[in-house]
Amino acid sequence: MAVVKTTGKKDFDRSKEHINIGTIGHVDHGKTTLTAAISTVLAKKGLAEAKDYASIDAAPEEKARGITINTAHIEYSTDKRHYAHVDCPGHADYIKNMITGAAQMDGAILVVAATDGPMPQTREHILLSKQVGVPKMVVFLNKIDLLEGEEEMVDLVEVEIRELLSSYDFDGDNTPIIRGSARGALEGKPEWEAKVLELMDAVDSYIDSPVREMDKPFLMAVEDVFTITGRGTVATGKVERGQVKLNEEVEIVGYREEPKKTVITGIEMFNKNLQTAMAGDNAGVLLRGVDRKDIERGQVIAKPKTIIPHTKFKAAIYALKKEEGGRHTPFFKNYKPQFYFRTTDVTGGIEFEPGREMVIPGDNVDLTVELIAPIAVEQGTKFSIREGGRTVGAGTVTEIIK
């Protein structure tokens, strides 16, 4: 039964902290059923709108970095927080979603069917979560209702999950594992509804509040540069994180070995003067003593000594399939595409892991990239792989080499 959302203050309580979360795990282990169960159980408390399996499973397409991904976003609240929850129908959609950062997860709910235990995609999703920087996950051990009287087997599955999490550097010993039945909760059985509420309590307490981008060091990617006669050089772009005030010192980073120091002497947005530019703003900043030739699109303006340009790094990449607009053929070790970071692309070469000869469209692989010019990147930076102006892959920097 759908519960009508009451239009009280509670629904749009801005004082609740916002967290992005998602369900991950092997195919048919119950991710979408659990997503439906969470919304349905919380709807009974007036904290969500009940969603059934079919409406979540018919996930709309969205594009991120030129890649089509089927993702279902639903929202719900607990007494403490407001959540945006992403669930993907297909395995390839999970990989694309995580690598492109279409939904940056602050934490994840790993769903494992107790009847099967961890399976190949369970491992792959845990590894991907580690690579793209998901800090913590809570485990829902599903389908417990099918294993009545088999307590020992369930205990063994739990041990296996904890060992698996620890092997990928998650805190396997302390990760909450909730035993339940998503289907039972969706059918309104009180003992299983209680388990969904227990799961959400664990998510509330174990998934840490993310450091909001406002608290991080200032960084703005340069999109455009122009000169104002008599005043100097202005760079425009979107502030990716942090904030900057008038007369603060910053560095221009990228393309050159050494950053250029300068001071911000003016900040404008929509032709209005500002004292501060902050994360999310599309702003223009006036830079003291900077010639037009000293700065270009693709560089970043950042708080001094907080980001350095690099040319070589390891990355997790997804190669688009032909049907997704990707290549029709594999690529080999001499492949030199463009790597698109923030506002610009730079040519680079690739090295495969030992034993790999090629990458076939649809593959999800780890490789090493070496760019022809240094770019401001760090662990977790997202990029697209392009050739001839079209996107053929997406990646996340997993480790800086030089």
UniProtKB/Swiss-Prot annotation:
GO terms for molecular function: GTP binding; GTPase activity; translation elongation factor activity. Residues 25-32 are annotated as: G1. Residues 87-90 are annotated as: G3. It holds the Pfam family GTP_EFTU_D2. Coiled coil: none annotated. It is an enzyme of class 3 (hydrolase). Keywords: Cytoplasm, Elongation factor, GTP-binding, Hydrolase, Magnesium, Metal-binding, Nucleotide-binding, Protein biosynthesis. The keyword GTP-binding applies. GO terms for cellular component: cytosol. Its EC number is 3.6.5.3. Belongs to the TRAFAC class translation factor GTPase superfamily. Classic translation factor GTPase family. EF-Tu/EF-1A subfamily. This is Elongation factor Tu. It comes from Mesomycoplasma hyopneumoniae (strain 7448) (Mycoplasma hyopneumoniae). The gene is tuf.
